[in-house]
Amino acid sequence: MRTQEVLCPTDFSATATHALKYAVEMANLYQVDIRLLHVVSPARSAHFYGVAVETPAALEQKLAQFVDEKMQSLQQEMQLGLKPGLNIKCIVRHGDASEEILAEAADVGMVVLASHGSSGLADFLKPHVSQDVVRLAKCPVLVVK
């Protein structure tokens, strides 16, 4: 692998969580760290994240808190399966999921992602994030069903 990391994008869906197990296996096999990525899409509503708010500022704060808690939980769960000395770096980006994943994938050795994620408006607008990543990434991509 080109660098010391496996990129694992997540949208917190069951399929994405299943893909995390494969990312841990790859990291252990190649003795590399994991970069866990979540992209907050502008097309996703507070309802998708299960957050009720009164103002845009409150929405931003609640979403950030929700995403941070989910990422920390996934990081702790994944760390249990990693060999000693390997680490997980959590990254949250804002924007189009395909674009942000591809930007993050520019300097990793491999991407491990789910074949499909959560359903909602974002998927209706751009349903094939995994296809975009497979087609455009410069590194190997493992797509997990």
Q: Language-model segments: which ranges?
A:
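Conserved beta-strand termini and adjacent loop/short-helix elements that scaffold enzyme active sites
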Residues: 37-39, 91-95, 144
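Intrinsically disordered or low-complexity boundary/linker segments at protein termini
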Residues: 1-18, 81-85, 89, 135-145
